[in-house]
């Protein structure tokens, strides 16, 4: 298995974390230098996802994250690889990860390398819907189909045909059709034309920040993209036409009823959903 870890060349602490996390398990890996806002990023967007450059809401860091995955896929396709495992540099690995990542016979026995598929290795501790896939369990972990949104791109295996699918799709979409890369890959299943995504359960990996949040702990590594998204979201709210005194007053007066309705909707949305554990 070729394991690629997307990481800024300057991220010494995170690279040390990855070297220790993968090394102690004897898992081979290679760093892929993540993009940041730069001329290189602009060139990559122009070549692969031209609609992304003019996107009005995604920040430069979000665009760089998006393109880091896209450029890595293009590299894998140029090298003729049938599939790759992709990780981000704040990932935590679960028990027996080496049985999945230091070898790939299990993958070839369960998936056709010439088909379009993704094996999602990560959990974000969200409530998600899954359904049986018919894929045999391996080392105590199941491969149900993901039938709902499940954000995050900290760990996944993607086949050559799936990489082609997303790159072709991204290249054709206008700015308004593009969203953060994890939304594009693991958002509404209809948006990816029902391409099969198998959600490993229990999950093999988790992002350190979300693992810490789920367990009410302090994050040791943090997340640049999460911080950037938060700032970007606040700026959008400030710039919104709805951010007037009249609208703010109406929202304040209707807050209780809106909260009740949100709780009711959340209860309905959680029916049949599970939180994929990490172990």
Swiss-Prot record:
One of its GO terms (molecular function) is glycosyltransferase activity. The keyword Glycosyltransferase applies. Keywords: Glycosyltransferase, Lipopolysaccharide biosynthesis, Transferase. Pfam families: Glyco_transf_25 (PF01755). The keyword Transferase applies. Its EC number is 2.-.-.-. One of its GO terms (biological process) is lipopolysaccharide biosynthetic process. Disulfide bonds: none annotated. Pathway: Glycan metabolism; lacto-N-neotetraose biosynthesis; Bacterial outer membrane biogenesis; lipooligosaccharide biosynthesis. Belongs to the glycosyltransferase 25 family. Adds the second galactose to the lacto-N-tetraose chain in lipooligosaccharide (LOS). This is Lacto-N-neotetraose biosynthesis glycosyltransferase LgtB. It comes from Neisseria meningitidis serogroup A / serotype 4A (strain DSM 15465 / Z2491).
């Amino acid at each position: 298995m070729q394991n690629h870890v997307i990481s800024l060349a300057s991220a010494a602490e995170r690279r040390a974390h990855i070297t220790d996390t993968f090394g102690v398990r004897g898992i081979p890996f290679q760093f892929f230098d993540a993009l940041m806002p730069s001329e290189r990023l602009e060139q990559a967007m122009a070549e692969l996802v031209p609609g992304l450059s003019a996107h009005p809401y995604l920040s430069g860091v979000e665009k760089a994250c998006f393109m880091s995955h896209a450029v890595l896929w293009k590299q894998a396709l140029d090298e003729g690889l049938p599939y790759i495992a992709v990780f981000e540099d704040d990932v935590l690995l679960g028990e027996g990860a080496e049985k999945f990542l230091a070898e790939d016979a299990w993958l070839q026995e369960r998936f056709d390398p010439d088909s379009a598929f993704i094996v999602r290795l990560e959990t974000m501790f969200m409530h998600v819907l899954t359904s049986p896939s018919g894929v045999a369990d391996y080392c105590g972990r199941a491969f149900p189909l993901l039938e709902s949104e499940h954000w995050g791109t900290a760990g996944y295996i993607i086949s050559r045909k799936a990489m082609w699918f997303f790159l072709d799709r991204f290249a054709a979409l206008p700015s308004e059709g593009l969203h953060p890369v994890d939304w594009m890959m693991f958002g509404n299943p209809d948006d990816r034309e029902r391409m099969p995504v198998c959600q490993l359960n229990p999950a093999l990996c988790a992002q350190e920040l979300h693992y810490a949040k789920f367990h009410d702990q302090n994050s040791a590594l943090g997340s640049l993209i999460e911080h950037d998204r938060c700032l970007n979201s606040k700026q959008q709210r400030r710039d919104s036409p709805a951010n007037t005194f009249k609208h703010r007053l109406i929202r304040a007066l209707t807050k209780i009823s809106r909260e009740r309705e949100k709780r009711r909707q959340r209860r309905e949305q959680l029916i049949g959903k599970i939180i994929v554990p990490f172990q």
